[in-house]
Amino acid sequence: MLGDLLMEINGQMTSITVEPPVAEGTKVQVQAASEISGRVSGASLETHYVFIRSDGQTGGGEGHGLINTADGEAIQVYYPWGMGRATSPGTFTVKGCVTFSTVSSDLEWLNEVLGVWEGTWDLANREWRTSVYEWEYPE
């Protein structure tokens, strides 16, 4: 069951690299710098590996990153899988899951969180916006 909103991510894609094709389609590497607000706040640097299927309309990928919180703590972020579909040329609605790892005693609760996210990637304007929710265990 979806739980509380953990964070809102608003970022700029600082680098977009089209790599050689793979079996799934066109492979794209995206690096992003983001501001994060919510239950967790701070800034992040992330790298995402995305493939866009040959239909140009759907795709998926994975990513990883580092969040530096407003309190100076570090959180490793891993996006093991995400999916998306085009809503207009260069713009995708995306969704997926995310896990966290930290040694911070104040944030160690994140080590047991599976997050789910949804948002938009605007390749033309190099922007991305994502909301991350906690996927809660059944009672």
Predicted segments with their positions:
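Beta-strand-enriched cores of mature, soluble protein domains
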Residues: 1-139
